[in-house]
UniProtKB/Swiss-Prot annotation:
Chain segments carrying region SBD2: 361-427
Species in which this protein is naturally found: Arabidopsis thaliana
Name assigned to this protein: 4-coumarate--CoA ligase 4
Family, similarity comment: Belongs to the ATP-dependent AMP-binding enzyme family.
SBD1 as annotated region, ranges: 291-360
Induction notes from the record: By wounding.
InterPro entries: AMP-bd_C, AMP-bd_C_sf, AMP-binding_CS, AMP-dep_synth/lig_dom, ANL_N_sf
Required co-factors: Mg(2+)
Note: Activates efficiently sinapate, besides the usual 4CL substrates (4-coumarate, caffeate, and ferulate).
């Protein structure tokens, strides 16, 4: 009996010790900056232009938008007047609160004005790539139930079927003196009808913070593109997390000229550039597309202070000898986002912009901004090369084990999860995909693998589904790509998995050689394989002209895997 009691006591004690060893709470990471008050009860346009109303300190006569293509300038007063007129014009055509308007436009002042007008009306903008094919446009327009499409004259032929189905087409052309002329296309409404509408005809709509304001399309962590419902509250929160407060994480000021050649239909340019610039009273220099010499000429002419980039753009700056011909000394911030920038590229671009603070940010369409370098803060922190920043203020982040879901401490890699008011409301008409992405506790699972170091800085290792499994070992493509790009005869590279009967998967490389290079497969394999452990060695190399990438700069690995499958089946 005594022995049984002792055994019971020892067993109970061991169980208690085991319970004490298990983590009793999540490892949750927050910003080094204190949380701030965010007025996310306001409609988006009220918030963005708050400094120009009431007791605000903004000067409406200052420059808001510079059209890089024509030199046309719009002041903050011009932008707000046009916003209200276009909203009234859209309303006159039958668009109401909650209706969806597709913006099928390249970077232009009209894109910005249209987005703001739709938001002011309480309607929803779904943004689309103007280079989409007719079927791609139709698929998004129908899935989003768009009632109107605002586009350019040269794109109208892609919209014939939609026009026949009753979708209103508003058309602009940028060949006129003022940047917009009437369309002569039958069945299309001229954009000038909107800009000349009587704003007094529209009573300001009542907008809830939970109303959807933007609906870009994203594949998320997997699957087909889905409509991402971003609310007024979510977008206001995402902007404020970056640029509001006494010590903003991203210190844009009214004296800045912010360059925008990254596509405005993508959330990065829309949120972190266009709307953040307007919130702070800065000037936004809009360029239709990235052309290296034109961009450098505009930097010199307008004394641009902020240049946001993506990895392909950084590569262009690094590899071009033309950079020496231009005065780029006005640039004080170079912000890399949309895709993780390798340390080798970061170090190289610093030499081209000697006066610029360089750092990275990290986010996704569904989550808003997740992290931002504190090197950009008004009172900056020391940061490490290669880090994508620290978690944004007024938000929480954790790193979870991909197998168990248990949260991990510092310096342990796992899936990055984020929680906060900046998150999307969900995917349009897809509750299952929403539930897979945002769990019951409100954590959005990004599908990105990373870790938080001892200084709260975040490092992205790879994408969850992009990891290569070699006999159970994890191989990160990003690591091998960094090595490949460091070779002087390689312009760009991507690594994907190839099926293998013995190892399950092996890494293979697609390589874009420098012009005139005679680099061979053996040269590439030798260069990489001598620098990595055996299971990370490149097994095959395929030479191609260009690495396929999305407009965001992310490698289109699905395309490369399909190409690999075709080549291996021959």
């Amino acid at each position: 009996m005594v022995l049984q009691q002792q055994t019971h006591f020892l067993t109970k004690k061991i169980d208690q010790e085991d319970e004490e060893e298990e983590p009793s709470h999540d490892f949750i990471f927050r910003s080094k900056l204190p949380d701030i008050f965010i007025p996310n009860h306001l409609p988006l346009t009220d918030y963005v232009f708050q400094r120009f109303s009431g007791d605000g300190d903004g000067d409406s006569s200052t420059t808001c938008i510079i059209d890089g293509a024509t030199g046309r300038i719009l002041t903050y007063a011009d932008v707000q007047t046009n916003m209200r007129r276009i909203a009234a014009g859209i309303h006159r055509l039958g668009i109401r609160h909650g209706d969806v308007v597709m913006l099928l436009l390249p970077n232009s002042p009209e894109f910005a004005l249209s987005f703001l007008a739709v938001a002011y009306l309480g309607a929803v903008s779904t943004t689309a790539n103007p280079f989409y094919t007719q079927p791609e446009i139709a698929k998004q327009a129908k899935a989003s139930a768009a009632k109107m499409i605002i586009t350019k004259k040269c794109l109208v032929d892609k919209l014939t079927n939609l026009k026949n189905d009753g979708v209103l087409i508003v058309c602009l052309d940028d060949d006129g003196d003022n940047g917009v002329v009437s369309s002569s296309d039958d069945g299309c409404v001229s954009f000038t009808e909107l800009t000349q509408a009587d704003e007094t005809e529209l009573l300001k709509p009542k907008i809830s913070p939970e109303d959807t304001v933007a609906m870009p399309y994203s594949s998320g962590t997997t699957g087909l593109p889905k409509g991402v419902m971003i609310t007024h509250k979510g977008l206001v929160t995402s902007i404020a997390q970056k640029v509001d407060g006494e010590n903003p994480n991203l210190n844009f000021t009214a004296n800045d000229v912010i360059l925008c050649f990254l596509p405005m239909f993508h959330i990065y340019a829309l949120d972190a550039l266009m709307l953040s610039a307007m919130r702070t009273g800065a000037a936004l220099l809009i360029v239709p597309r990235f052309e290296l010499n034109l961009v450098m000429e505009l930097i010199q002419r307008y004394k641009v202070t902020v240049v946001p980039v993506a990895p392909p753009v950084v590569l262009a700056f690094i590899k071009s000898p033309e950079t020496e011909r231009y005065d780029l000394s006005s640039v004080r911030i170079m912000l890399s986002g949309a895709a993780t920038l390798k340390k080798e590229l970061e170090d190289a671009v610093r030499l081209k912009f000697p006066n610029a603070i360089f750092g990275q940010g990290y986010g996704m369409t569904e989550s808003g901004t997740v992290a931002k370098s504190l090197a950009f803060a008004k009172n900056p922190f020391k940061t490490k090369s290669g880090a994508c920043g620290t978690v944004i203020r007024n938000a929480e982040m954790k790193v979870v084990d991909t197998e168990t879901g248990i949260s991990l401490p510092r310096n342990k890699s796992g899936e990055i999860c984020v929680r906060g008011h900046q998150l999307m409301k969900g995917y349009l008409n897809d509750p299952e995909a929403t539930a897979r992405t945002i769990d019951k506790d409100g954590w959005l699972h990004t599908g990105d693998i990373g870790f938080v170091d001892d200084d709260d800085e975040i490092f992205i290792v790879d994408r969850l589904k992009e990891l290569i499994k070699f006999k159970g070992y994890q191989v990160a493509p990003a690591e091998l790509e960094a090595l490949l790009i460091s070779h002087p005869s390689i312009d760009d590279a991507a690594v994907v998995a190839m099926k293998d009967e013995v190892a399950d998967e092996v890494p293979v490389a697609f390589v874009a050689r420098s012009q005139g290079s005679q680099l061979t497969e053996d040269d590439v394999k030798s260069y990489v394989n001598k620098q990595v452990v055996h299971y990370k060695r490149i097994k095959m190399v395929f030479f191609i002209e260009v690495i396929p990438k999305a407009v965001s700069g992310k490698i289109l690995r699905k395309d490369l895997r399909a190409k690999l499958e075709t080549m291996c089946s021959k």
